[in-house]
Amino acid sequence: PPPGKKTRGRVKIKMEFIDNKLRRYTTFSKRKTGIMKKAYELSTLTGTQVLLLVASETGHVYTFATRKLQPMITSETGKALIQTCLNSPDSPPRSDPTTDQRMSATGFEETDLTYQVSESDSSGETKDVLKPTFTVTNLPGTTSTIQTAPTTSSSMQVSSGPSFPITNYLAPVSASISPSAVTSANGTVLKTTGASAVTSGGLMQIPTGFTLMSGGTMAQQVPVQAIQVHQAPQQTSPSSDSSTDLTQTSPSGTVTLPATIMTSSVPTTVGGHMMYPSPHAVMYAPTSGLADGGLAVLNAFSQTPSAMQVSHSQVQDQGGVPQVFLTAPSGTVQIPVSAVQLHQMAVIGQQSSSGSSLTELQXVNLDTSHNAKSD
């Protein structure tokens, strides 16, 4: 072309890294906008789910995500996973793109990722995510109105701070549907909350059938394990008196929980008895005799013959709170439980109108010399 003439039409540029910083920045911002627009157009025109993530060399992350895929970015686990990936050491710079199929211009079909497509996809998008895990036929002491809602939704929420280990990312299930399970009148919600994370609201839902394995690797990151099991039966006048609270906290610095916490472990009512699951044992008490501290511990570890003993302290006055001490010989059980409090308000099955009968359960850890540390 003559000297004064600018190039007309399209110019094919070389597919290689742009060394000029200014030109590279300009190309990035222009093409980022373009690819975001393309992603939006693709999802709108075809009604498909699109997730696009662009990380700039200045450390900024730009995303486009349709509604179903937004939890991949907004949830705490999703954020942590993205952070981990972006902070990982660089692969060999600008290697031949043909080595990685996903880096080819046409993309790559993830054959092991599929999802359910139904006829009316837009009508109920959350219907596959939360299935009822068990059926409540009748609870002692509740009114017969529970028969109208025989299925009980059960959800498990794991929330933690930035230090939450990424290995617990089990399933990218949307967290936006959790309120539907929480607000149901006879819903049972099992929450596991990390200590550093009481304020951070990142929720992750694990479908039933998954097992949350707490190994020794989590000792530093999740210092306190608290498990709350709420069971509020549906009745004509629901009040806080009929809820059963099981709170287990452990203030010690490193907690190793070798037990597996199943999402299906909710209090089960068997013939007037309440079974309270806990990470180390199943606490079992008849509902009628909770006030006198009659509580047996079924040990979860069968390989240790004498793992836990239960000793009762006598209740002298009528206003006293019965205390039960769980003692574990050192070396048999790996769970240092420092305080277990069991508040039983108006035991289900004998809905007393006079108020709440309070049962407090304290588990005290024994050190090597078997001296009970008094709280």
UniProtKB/Swiss-Prot annotation:
Domain named MADS-box: residues: 10-64
UniProt keyword list: Activator, Developmental protein, DNA-binding, Nucleus, Phosphoprotein, Transcription, Transcription regulation
Biased composition (Low complexity): 233-252
Annotated region described as Disordered, given as residue ranges: 228-257
Entry's localization field: Nucleus
A Pfam family the protein falls into: SRF-TF
InterPro entries noted in UniProt: MADS-box/MEF2_TF, SRF-like_MADS-box, TF_MADSbox, TF_MADSbox_sf
Primary localisation category: nucleus
GO molecular function term, any single one: protein dimerization activity
Gene Ontology CC: nucleus
GO BP annotations listed: actin cytoskeleton organization; positive regulation of transcription by RNA polymerase II
Subunit structure: Binds DNA as a multimer, probably a dimer.
Function: SRF is a transcription factor that binds to the serum response element (SRE), a short sequence of dyad symmetry located 300 bp to the 5' of the site of transcription initiation of some genes (such as FOS). Together with MRTFA transcription coactivator, controls expression of genes regulating the cytoskeleton during development, morphogenesis and cell migration.
Protein name (Swiss-Prot/TrEMBL): Serum response factor
Gene expressing this chain: SRF
